[in-house]
Amino acid sequence: VTAMFYEIRTYRLKNGSIPTYLKAVEEEGIAIQKSHLGHLVGYFYSEIGTINEIVHIWAFSSLDDREARRQQLMADPQWQAFLPKIRDLIEVAENKIMKAANFSPTKQAG
């Protein structure tokens, strides 16, 4: 898939909850997300700098593609059952949609 748009989701978690969050996502959540959202560019947690931060980046061919995939994810009963396991760990959520510059390696690799 040629990525035109990148969704960058950043969560600030409650103090000390990164291990719990990552365990839940690794064991259950990521498989559900990947089945609907498609191309995971990366999933990160902070080591230095802003503490208790999670960033995950997803690639989409268009904004319509992103919208359709997000709707499918939200309609999935497995995802709805999973959400309570992480929802209370998240204090602040930020979402950005970005486009790659023409000279970006991500654009050239797409």
Where are these regions (language model features)?
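Short amphipathic alpha-helical segments
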Residues: 17-42
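Short amphipathic alpha-helices within nucleic acid-binding modules
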Residues: 19-21, 62-74
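Short, conserved loop/turn and helix-capping segments at secondary-structure boundaries
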Residues: 27, 73-76
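A common structural junction motif
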Residues: 32, 77-78
